């Protein structure tokens, strides 16, 4: 058995993190996956002082968990999401240096006999922060969304990357010719036209053009269809599970799971990599 916990879109909400840490302490999973949008929106003051959520709040609590669990401390795989400023990678790197987690974006990592891949970027959104946004399969931008070449970034990137980079190209480079039959992909974006990317855009128009209610990545969808990894993990679209009545889907043989949730609770997904189709989700 390779027991895993998965959460996403916690947005720095301390109560959700406390519930997650309590579950990890009680259940002693082999791995914990953090699927992006980890940081507080607007960075409110932290209890007890400090302004860096990762270093001043999360880091000490992960250290406490490691001290409590000892050798049973889980492998923690983390990516950022589109609401997380890339400038905070410095703090995430510091937590990795301390051995508390691994920043998985753009990397292939190992968990026993399983390969773990992380990818944080999402297709263009209506929001201004573009650190983790890419064109999807082309330079097309849905009505109402803002191009990755516009908006703002907390960390500068080369103009060519902004203009020509795509999720499709990134995934080809990330996976190469690897055998993905025992691979887990930790994404922030869900795949397009699934139960996991259904947004509350019904009857909405921009300049009389109806908006697509599916806002996931076409590139991720095609990648999963073609390469068939064992499991894909997703977040980003908080309301999807409520609107589609499901937090999981399948693309061929690939099990696709989402931990996004639009209520106040923590959505905690539990799964075993030896039987991911038996995954469960609990609202805590």
Describe each model-derived feature in a short phrase.
Residues 11-15, 39-43, 78-90, 109-110, ...:
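Active-site environment of divalent metal-dependent phosphoester hydrolases
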Residues 8, 39-57, 126-140:
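Acidic/histidine-rich helix-loop elements
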Residues 51-60, 206-218:
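A short acidic, glycine-rich active-site loop
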Residues 108-112, 208-211, 218-226, 239-284:
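Binuclear metal-dependent phosphoesterase catalytic core
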Residues 114-211:
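Active-site-proximal loop/helix segment associated with metal-binding centers of metalloenzymes
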Residues 9, 32, 37, 81, ...:
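Divalent metal-coordination and catalytic microenvironments
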Residues 14-111, 259:
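Core catalytic region of metal-dependent phosphoesterases/phosphodiesterases
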Residues 2-11, 113-125, 149, 184-188, ...:
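Active-site-proximal beta-strand elements of phosphoester/diester hydrolases
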């Amino acid at each position: 058995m390779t027991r895993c916990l998965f959460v996403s879109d916690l947005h720095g909400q301390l109560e959700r993190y406390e519930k997650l840490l309590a579950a990890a302490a009680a259940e002693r999973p082999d791995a914990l996956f953090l699927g992006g949008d980890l940081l507080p929106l607007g960075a409110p003051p932290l209890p007890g002082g400090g302004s860096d959520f990762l270093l001043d709040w999360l880091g000490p609590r992960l250290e406490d968990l490691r001290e409590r669990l000892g050798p049973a401390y889980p492998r923690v795989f983390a990516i950022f999401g589109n609401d997380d400023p890339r400038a905070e990678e410095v703090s995430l790197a510091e937590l990795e240096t301390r051995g508390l987690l691994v920043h998985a974006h753009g990397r292939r990592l190992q968990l026993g006999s399983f390969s773990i891949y992380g990818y944080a970027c999402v297709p263009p959104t209506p929001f201004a922060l573009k650190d983790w946004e890419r064109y999807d399969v082309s330079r097309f931008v849905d009505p109402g969304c803002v191009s990755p070449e516009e908006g703002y970034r907390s960390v500068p990137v080369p103009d060519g990357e902004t203009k020509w980079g795509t999720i499709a190209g990134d995934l080809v480079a990330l996976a190469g010719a690897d055998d993905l039959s025992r691979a887990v992909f930790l994404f922030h974006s869900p795949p397009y036209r699934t139960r996991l990317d259904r947004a509350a855009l019904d009857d909405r128009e921009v300049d009389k053009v109806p908006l697509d209610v599916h806002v996931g990545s076409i590139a991720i969808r095609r990648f999963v269809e073609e390469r068939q990894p064992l499991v894909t993990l997703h977040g980003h679209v908080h309301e999807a599970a409520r609107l589609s009545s499901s937090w999981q889907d399948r693309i061929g043989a690939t099990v696709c799971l989402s931990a996004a949730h639009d209520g106040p609770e923590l959505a905690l997904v539990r799964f075993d990599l030896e039987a991911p189709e038996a995954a469960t989700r609990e609202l805590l």
